[in-house]
Amino acid sequence: MDREDINPMLSRLDVENNNTFSSFVDKTLMMMPPSTFSGEVEPSSSSSWYPESFHVHAPPLPPENDQIGEKGKELKEKRSRKVPRIAFHTRSDDDVLDDGYRWRKYGQKSVKHNAHPRSYYRCTYHTCNVKKQVQRLAKDPNVVVTTYEGVHNHPCEKLMETLNPLLRQLQFLSSFSNL
């Protein structure tokens, strides 16, 4: 499959950088061919917000057949390890939705053809490299697009806060059963 066959709406630079969520957020997500979707995200009834979209996975680029030195090969291997990206469309009045993790805002920029800026966040857990981008759609400002890049390597902090009292109770009760 040629790079240009992946999606005609993306420029070659966007495809090479796996930047499917550049300034074309609304257009690209709405016009991507079905082959780039790897599955459905089912909303949970226990969730406080319901995603209205899908899991997007950009296919890896084909290897190039040029002669590269050792450092070039290492860089190419590092670039070929793609971090998973997941995008959710959510109808909400709030810009930042509570997903159970703690985030630190590290940037914001205005985007062409959109009155709403894009905000950039990092997970605050010390060993976690997950990032997220939050932006409203230009065509429908009631929809927030949240794009996650990476996978958390720790439990959800809010879930643990909720479960800690229950776990303490279980430990307390199990200490009686051991007597």
Swiss-Prot record:
Subcellular location: Nucleus
Cystine crosslinks: none
Gene3D superfamilies, alphabetized: WRKY domain
Keyword Transmembrane: no
Known DNA-binding region: 92-157
GO cellular component: nucleus
PROSITE patterns (alphabetical): WRKY (PS50811)
InterPro entries in the record: WRKY_dom, WRKY_dom_sf, WRKY_plant
Alphabetized GO MF terms: DNA-binding transcription factor activity; sequence-specific DNA binding
Superkingdom of the source species: Eukaryota
Keywords, ordered alphabetically: DNA-binding, Nucleus, Transcription, Transcription regulation
Main location: nucleus
Signal peptide per UniProt: none
Family: Belongs to the WRKY group II-c family.
UniProt function note: Transcription factor. Interacts specifically with the W box (5'-(T)TGAC[CT]-3'), a frequently occurring elicitor-responsive cis-acting element.
Name of the molecule in the record: Probable WRKY transcription factor 24
Organism (species): Arabidopsis thaliana (Mouse-ear cress)
Gene, per the UniProt record: WRKY24
